Amino acid sequence: MRVVAVREKKGNALFSVRVQPRASKTAVSGPYAGGLKITLKAAPVDDAANRECCRLFAGMFGIADGRVHVVSGRSSRSKSVMLEGVSSREAEEAFERFGL
């Protein structure tokens, strides 16, 4: 059963993220409205929370930070994240391995 809705655009996986900045730890909290809810230690100042969001998913997928992009919602808690060079199928399989 797929909880995270992953789309694909030009060979890159896209999915929705709801962010809670200034949390006690950086982690994936679980599913949220077809996407994921994450907590970030970083404050939403000077793009720090967006950079930490990218680092979190880069670590999960074993890819370079520069291959993870916040493509919409840079100044919002609701964001769209793109994994460059990762297909939607690969992303879905990874989320399933993580129990998401």
Curated annotation (Swiss-Prot):
Pfam families tied to this protein:
DUF167
Q: Please indicate which superkingdom the organism of origin belongs to.
A: Bacteria
Q: What is this protein called?
A: UPF0235 protein Cvib_0403
Concerning NCBIfam families, the annotation shows: DUF167 family protein (TIGR00251)
Q: Name one GO cellular component term.
A: cytoplasm
SUPFAM superfamilies reported in the protein's UniProt record = YggU-like
Gene3D superfamilies tied to this protein: YggU-like
Family (UniProt): Belongs to the UPF0235 family.
